[in-house]
């Protein structure tokens, strides 16, 4: 449903410049005129705009709220607006819909997928459960609604260790989909009956241990902020354990944890191992700190599909709307609620 009328010539002209391609919508600059028009259209639609930490800077700047996916989904549920525009990847918008079933949830480009969420399907999970009857399924929030619906308890990167530790030690646990977060949980809990799915985020998996070690040795006074989805998380802990890098300078953190640490660090330089969009929020939080990417090529092409053109189109056309089957949503909601009952989930991812 369009929110334009005959007087909206500026929006009409801007939308007319939009072109579509397999990599996303283009043709509109994220300038001050665009930002003002986005805010005006959001008000007309009665919408609140949420942006993930990995979004383009101009998308983060125009959003009403910026954060990790679970925190944003909880904000969506509490927001007075009836329409949620979720600037992130598709599973994140699904999670917002699960927690806000009566609201309209829009994503600026429904093609914005996620390699990690796509690494396990409902069929995969059903087959895995059949191989391990009676096992407890723990799924990272970075999963589709259909996978959450087959899950016993969801977890975030902040509370994954606590969630697994809360489960009867005699019961098998199936942890999905991220193999690096799963390895971190196994290492921290010492749990031998924890089975880990071999999924990964292509961006985080590409931040390798050799790269991290080289950067760390070249910057001995820096702190390391390492996301547990990274393929280099084990290398970071190894560097600390071997004394190659001070243990108190190595921090395995969710995106929310990184922001908290940025506000308290005494370091003058921090090496950051996560998607490069996170640097924008970190630098805003602590401008006195020199935040540098361990790998400056670690950019998620799916996150960057949420362009200024895509957001403008979304607000004008009311597209793309996110739908989740009510039965799947109810089952997925229960798995998220069980996680919340165990304790505060902290940063989502």
UniProtKB/Swiss-Prot annotation:
The keyword Iron applies. Its main location: cytoplasm. Pathway: Cofactor biosynthesis; NAD(+) biosynthesis; quinolinate from iminoaspartate: step 1/1. Keywords: 4Fe-4S, Cytoplasm, Iron, Iron-sulfur, Metal-binding, Pyridine nucleotide biosynthesis, Transferase. It catalyses: iminosuccinate + dihydroxyacetone phosphate = quinolinate + phosphate + 2 H2O + H(+). Coiled coil: none annotated. Its cofactor is [4Fe-4S] cluster. GO terms for biological process: 'de novo' NAD biosynthetic process from L-aspartate. Its EC number is 2.5.1.72. Belongs to the quinolinate synthase family. Type 2 subfamily. This is Quinolinate synthase. It comes from Mycobacterium avium (strain 104).
